[in-house]
Amino acid sequence: MNLDFDLYILYGNSILPECILILSLVILLIVDSIYGKKDTPWLYIIPFSGLVTSITVLFFQWEEEPIITFMGSFQINTFNKIFQFLILLCSVLCVPLSVDYIQCTEMAITEFLSFILTATLGATFLCGANDPVTIFVSLECLSLCSYLLSGYTKRDVRSNEATMKYLLMGGTSSSILAYGFSWLYGLSGGQTQLQEIAKGLISTQMYNSPGTSIAPICTMVGIGFKLSLVPFHQWTPDVYEGSPTPVVAFLSVVSKVAVSALAIRILNIVFPLSSNEWHSVLEILAISSMILGNFIAITQTSMKRMLAYSSISQIGYIMIGIIAGNSNGYTSVVTYMLFYIFMNLGTFACIILFSSRTGTDNIRDYAGLYLKDPLLASCFASCLLSLGGVPPLSGFFGKLYLFWCGWQAGLHSLVSIGLFTSVISIYYYLKIIKLLVTKRNEEVTPYITNYINSSYFLTSKNVTELSMMICVIASTVLGLAVNPIITMAQNSIFSSRFTSSLLIL
């Protein structure tokens, strides 16, 4: 007992936000076992409170000195904390989004919330993981819960199909990533910490060996799959279309934030001497994602499949900041991801509300929604315009700063393609908005004709509508406060010893 207590004193405070998530998970399971199968909708309070508490503790620990703990397997600094905050924020918003959906579909509440908490836990650990084993375990903690969540509606054939594709391709990518890690372990002389692996590659003079080319390739393939970069994106449309919509909302942001943090850390710490090579590869992946994602999104008839291809293009934009390879680039990534969380979750909140009242996901069935539900249509249009980067919404300022940082870093062709494809994205977003406000009777489907409006202006009937309003307001107002947000992100990144000592500034 003394040893356990000493270990907690030594390590527990440094991972207190993660410990709170674990405690919330344990309490959730205990409460469920006590109440059995009784109707306990208030169970959502447990994970929600745990997530909010974790964010609060994270803020209190923000100014603490950077450390590497757990015998070198976990790194804590403000660079990692800012990504952990984004993950926790996304989870806090996703829990209310799932309340009414799960009640309508009569899915098991406890297991769903347990998977959300466990996936969040894996994502937060992934942001600070400092050795290949911890990285792999954290990534699989996130991935396995993602597979289970995507197939949560087990009676739905599309959901089962999506889960199988996700599981098979996810397992393959994880195997490739583990294979790359094994090369790093061998070439570095048996080192395990990321910093020691980099030093080992230099001391053993293995940087010019063929094996050193295999390791970053395997790493980028694994990361490319998790981020849905082209050509590793094939699973994304099917998973988005077949999975429960709250799950899609969760996965569309959390995995991107966590794996982006991993990509920045592992590529800059382990492969700084081959930065030109992996920069070139990432440029090709980013360009392919921006072009293919936006052009295929135009042809989609399913709303969730359209957002799947839209998310592929969005990660292409985010890659511009990562490829920039300096503190300003990473600041732009953090800033845009903060805006992306609100505008993307706001969009999915609108889809959840519409599909729960109509049972359809077809884009054509949204025609005339403004006549029946002006509030929902207005919120949906606002989020779509923000995703497209239309001023004065937050998406515009996020993309503007992202492209400016890329231009300053000399990525002129990449930024030019980003600007061009952003215009393409505005086209298919406006096409949907045109459908929302149409007054032509021949375009209005029976879904809208029989639509029952259960909400009134500025009045929330359920937590999903409340979450939608929060996301819409944030995706609008945050654009007006972009300068303070950029300043806070810059201060957090500059104060991190990770960025000051290891990243290319």
Curated annotation (Swiss-Prot):
Signal peptide: none annotated. The chain crosses the membrane at residues 15-35, 40-60, 82-102, 107-127, 132-152, 167-187, 212-232, 244-264, 278-298, 306-326, 334-354, 377-397, 400-420, 466-486. One of its GO terms (cellular component) is chloroplast thylakoid membrane. It is a multi-pass membrane protein. Keywords: Chloroplast, Membrane, NAD, NADP, Plastid, Plastoquinone, Quinone, Thylakoid, Translocase, Transmembrane, Transmembrane helix, Transport. It catalyses: a plastoquinone + NADH + (n+1) H(+)(in) = a plastoquinol + NAD(+) + n H(+)(out); a plastoquinone + NADPH + (n+1) H(+)(in) = a plastoquinol + NADP(+) + n H(+)(out). The keyword Zinc does not apply. GO terms for biological process: ATP synthesis coupled electron transport; photosynthesis, light reaction. It is found in: Plastid, Chloroplast thylakoid membrane. Its EC number is 7.1.1.-. InterPro entries: NADH-Q_OxRdtase_suN/2, ND/Mrp_TM, Ndh2_N. One of its GO terms (molecular function) is quinone binding. Its main location: plastid. Belongs to the complex I subunit 2 family. NDH shuttles electrons from NAD(P)H:plastoquinone, via FMN and iron-sulfur (Fe-S) centers, to quinones in the photosynthetic chain and possibly in a chloroplast respiratory chain. The immediate electron acceptor for the enzyme in this species is believed to be plastoquinone. Couples the redox reaction to proton translocation, and thus conserves the redox energy in a proton gradient. HAMAP family: NDH1_NuoN_1. NDH is composed of at least 16 different subunits, 5 of which are encoded in the nucleus. This is NAD(P)H-quinone oxidoreductase subunit 2, chloroplastic. It comes from Huperzia lucidula.
